[in-house]
């Protein structure tokens, strides 16, 4: 701990205020999938901005209980650090809807990309020859401004599947996080399809990727200050983390086209979180 008791309390509350929880979404899910953009001859191309401009012109539709619902593509498809990558995101949903949302986004993404001569490729690791263009987002441009080329290459060459599980409040989130952290190495093995190459490359970008257990939110706050993410919790890049959106995020899984495989990861993470609830 640092400073007097009043300073510690203020410091802790400032840190905790970054995390917003909504009890109605407890044990709800969200899945993020990263992919590379390639042309018909499998050439990796930095065309994320062009692709997003095209995708965001139209809404996608979803059939639900006999009705056709509109899906906002701006919420479902976004950019990554690499201009060769896109990220898709499901809306918050319950476990039984996961596979349907993944298929809905997959079908629509492939169709939209095909209209501009692009394809989604779900490699865990791209070749060393991958273009290193950074998406023109101020945050990513700032992050990469002084980044060594080796680190930039590593950051651009790997993609993953990230899974969020909603939590009702701060204390429950910390309890579930600690339980999940114990399972991290097992989940890393389950989510690897590159014989450890993606994990090795990720270690070049962020060597400190293993989640740490915390005795309390003050313990978490102290570590955040020491590790440099206290003022922006998005900068915590460990494989399991509590997010500002009030979720436990599992970040160790690689990219894959196989939706059934992703759903198996989601079910396992759901069980880990549910079993840890008080």
Indicate residue ranges for each PLM-predicted region.
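Terminal catalytic/cofactor-binding subdomain
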Residues: 1-149, 157, 246, 260-278
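Loop-rich catalytic cores of soluble enzymes, especially ATP-dependent carboxylate-amine ligases
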Residues: 138, 142-151, 155-260
